[in-house]
Regions:
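Structural beta-alpha unit
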Residues: 1-11, 16, 129-164, 170-171, ...
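General small-molecule cofactor/ligand-binding pocket signal
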Residues: 40, 89-91, 137-142, 193
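Short acidic active-site motifs
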Residues: 27, 124, 146-151, 180
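Glycine-rich, Arg-bearing micro-motifs that act as flexible, cationic patches
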Residues: 11-30, 161-187
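Short beta-strand elements of ligand-binding domains
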Residues: 10-13, 38-44, 193-196
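Short, structured interface segments
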Residues: 28-47
Length: 209
């Protein structure tokens, strides 16, 4: 893969007969974490005509690499939408008010704080969507953990594909780090396209040098 410079790796996934959910193997996780090319994990499910494709973004990130990855996620998702005659939607999760802050600071107003965070995420996501001529109706900005929000929105929309960014060993773009990345993907019951940021160098490539 690294030596030949392929543009895409497609890997089949297995469905657990009892749980009726997709089971990702250690090989799947290895590819997601270390493969420099986009990885498409597919299940045995046909894509419907005029379906939905969901792009998972973090519109409030201030990291330039993450912001660039957001745009790549949307561009690649839109390209697939054009091929599949599907509708593109964005999903952005924002955190709930930390309980410990409300307890430790008596004058803290959790309601006001939560509204401020929500407003920031809505405005940032809508602005990102506008760059790609997407309407606000195509944006889903919801409170909660990414591993809860993204699969929930994907299920409600009956999305055939979720496009998501990964940044190697640190997990998914921006807020999606560590085990959170695996929880998100593990909770999705649809195809997943995992993208790396531009300039990503696989640790496997370093070993080959």
């Amino acid at each position: 893969m690294i030596n030949d410079g392929y543009d895409l790796v497609v890997k089949g996934t297995h469905q657990h007969d009892t749980l009726k959910s997709v089971i990702f193997t250690p090989t799947d996780w290895h590819l997601i974490r270390k493969c420099p090319a986009p990885v498409l994990l597919v299940k045995e499910k046909e894509w419907p005509a005029h379906g939905n494709i969901l792009a998972a973004v973090n519109a409030v990130s201030e990291n330039e690499q993450h912001l660039a990855l957001n745009k790549r996620i949307i561009n690649d998702a839109r390209f697939i939408c054009d091929l599949a005659n599907a509708q593109l939607n964005l999903v952005n999760a924002y955190p709930a008010t930390p309980v410990n802050i409300a307890i430790e600071i008596p004058e803290f107003n959790p309601g006001l704080y939560n509204e401020s965070v929500k407003k920031h995420h809505i405005e940032s996501t809508n602005a990102l969507a506008a760059e790609f001529n997407l309407s606000q109706e195509q944006c889903f900005i919801e409170e909660g953990l990414p591993e809860d929000v993204i699969p929930d929105v994907a299920k409600r929309l009956n999305s055939e594909l979720v496009v998501i960014g990964t940044v190697g060993r640190t997990g998914l773009s921006a807020a999606l780090v560590g085990n959170t990345a695996e929880h998100v993907i593990d909770s999705l019951d649809c195809d997943v396209l995992a993208l790396k940021p531009d300039g990503y160098v696989s640790p496997m490539a370093k070993k080959l040098d």
